[in-house]
A protein has these predicted regions:
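Short N-terminal helix/helix-N-cap motif within the alpha/beta-hydrolase-1
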Residues: 103-107, 134
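A short glycine-rich, Lys/Arg-flanked "PGG" loop and its adjoining helix->strand segment in the class I
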Residues: 107-118
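Conserved N-terminal segment of class I S-adenosyl-L-methionine
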Residues: 1-88, 92, 106-109, 124, ...
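Conserved beta-strand signature within the Rossmann-like core of class I S-adenosyl-L-methionine
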Residues: 120-126
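Short, flexible, mixed-charge acidic loops at enzyme active sites
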Residues: 135-143
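Histidine-centered beta-alpha loop that forms part of the nucleotide-sugar donor binding/catalytic region
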Residues: 97, 127-129, 180-181
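Acceptor-substrate binding/catalytic loop of class I
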Residues: 146-163
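A short beta-strand submotif of the Rossmann-like class I SAM-dependent methyltransferase core
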Residues: 92-98
Length: 230
């Protein structure tokens, strides 16, 4: 759902109700300039906060209040583990508008799970492919990719609510909260309100999902994602 002109420096307000009261160490995965990490740090009173992103320009212009900003590909073996060794463990991991851009987000979630302590929290924002605009385009055969948004041409994976929850739980994390973001389309908000939420799967633009780590080993997702794309 990235907007290349402003995503890297925008704050994701819809996920704020899911934030823990306190978080000592924050890792913002694919977080651009680290704006969210900096904002959440202020809210949660964090001692350590940093960002990792694949875009050199975003990291070059990262928020200077952060403790670290790393330019690297989180899908490459050893990258997440190296960040953990130097700066972890992280009791809050942010994955905001990034998982849909990855070839194997299931494997990344498993690696992030492994660098969280018991009681740690992961929060993801994931676009909803069941949104009425996507359904309309499939039915009319007008699926045209764009530079950003729901039809971002760099999206590699697509999720509805159930598969987004499955993604977050693939390695043993437990989802305990899911919030819906409707976007700014007035008619979608009216339809959602009049239907008392029954049209939620179609009016929801994005899901904000919170998952927690409890005691126990990290489960290997294996080929979990090979048969799940929506």
């Amino acid at each position: 759902m990235r907007n290349p002109s402003n995503y890297a420096k925008s704050v994701n307000r819809p996920m704020w109700p899911l934030l823990p009261a306190r978080a000592a160490r924050i890792l913002d995965v694919g977080g651009g300039h680290g704006t969210n990490a900096a904002a959440v740090r202020s809210k949660c009173g964090s001692r350590i906060a940093g960002v990792v992103d694949i875009a050199p320009d975003a990291i070059e212009h990262h928020d200077r209040s952060l403790d670290f900003a790393i330019c690297d590909d989180i899908e490459q073996p050893g990258v997440i583990e190296a960040i953990h060794t130097t700066h972890g463990p992280f009791d809050l991991v942010l994955c905001l508008d990034v998982l849909e851009h990855l070839a194997d987000p299931w494997r990344v979630i498993a690696r992030l799970h492994s660098i969280m302590p018991d009681g740690g929290t992961a929060i993801a924002s994931i676009p909803n492919i069941q949104n009425y605009r996507a359904v309309y385009r499939v039915l009319t055969g007008t699926w045209n990719y764009r530079a950003s948004g729901l039809f971002d041409r760099t999206h590699l994976r697509y999720f509805a609510r159930s598969s987004a929850v499955e993604l977050m739980e693939c390695s043993g994390l437990r989802v305990d909260a899911v919030c819906r973001a409707l976007g700014h389309h007035r008619l979608a908000r009216i339809a959602d309100r009049l239907s008392l939420g029954l049209l939620g799967p179609f009016t929801t633009l994005q899901y904000q999902i919170r998952a927690r780590r409890f005691s126990g080993d990290v489960r290997d997702p294996g080929s979990f994602g090979s048969n799940v794309s929506s």
